[in-house]
Amino acid sequence: MSELFHHIATRPADLVAGWRDGAPVSHGAWLARVRAWAALGARTPGARVALFHDDSLEFAAALLGAWLSGKTVWLSADTLPASCAALGQAVDAFWGQFPPAHAPGAPGPQDAWEGAIVAPAPDHPAVVVFTSGSTGQPAPIPKRLAQLLDEVAALQAQFGAGLEGAAVLATVSHQHIYGLLFRILWPLAAGRAIHAARHEFP
């Protein structure tokens, strides 16, 4: 259960964590962003934050930072007014690239959380995702940390052997559960480089 967080805490700082605009992002630089978001979480009142960010590396840092500071992350597929209004009824703060009217939070230069990188409890309410809404209003679905990491372990067991050294590009947004698993959590657990931008297809 704690392997994801152990790997994140102990990987060499010069390891390539991902790519942004064709340039490598080191694990050390990315981990500093995790700590910055965790510091924001530590000073953000409430337990529930809505997170939206196009950049997969920054999204991953914010997600881990939220968990380290005890937050539950609510994911939205978009930042349309109706989506933001619904989130506003459920969360205590908005993080990332939401419209300015929602005062989205982001770490400041002073934010540098110094706590240990350790896993929250397995039953920590890690994320809330939404159904597509194709048959009615989108419905929130909570996921515990153990559920997410069990799915990641299953993916690694089934497909991981042939993917050593692979970098991860994705067409599915990490704001959705499949993108969250395949584009963010599985690569983080396995030490694969993440591309910050979404791969547009075709």
For each predicted feature, which ranges?
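Conserved AMP-binding/adenylate-forming
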Residues: 39-79, 166-174
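Conserved AMP-binding A3 loop
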Residues: 24-28, 118, 124-153
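AMP-binding/adenylate-forming
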Residues: 89-99, 142-158, 163-202
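A short N-terminal helical cap/helix-turn-helix that marks the beginning
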Residues: 1-16
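Conserved AMP-binding/adenylate-forming core of the ANL superfamily
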Residues: 14-43, 143-146
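Conserved pre-ATP/AMP-binding loop-to-beta segment of ANL
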Residues: 9-13, 112-130, 161-168
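Flexible, low-complexity linker/hinge segments
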Residues: 99-125, 151-152, 157
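ATP-dependent adenylate-forming carboxylate-activation enzymes
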Residues: 53, 74-87, 192-202
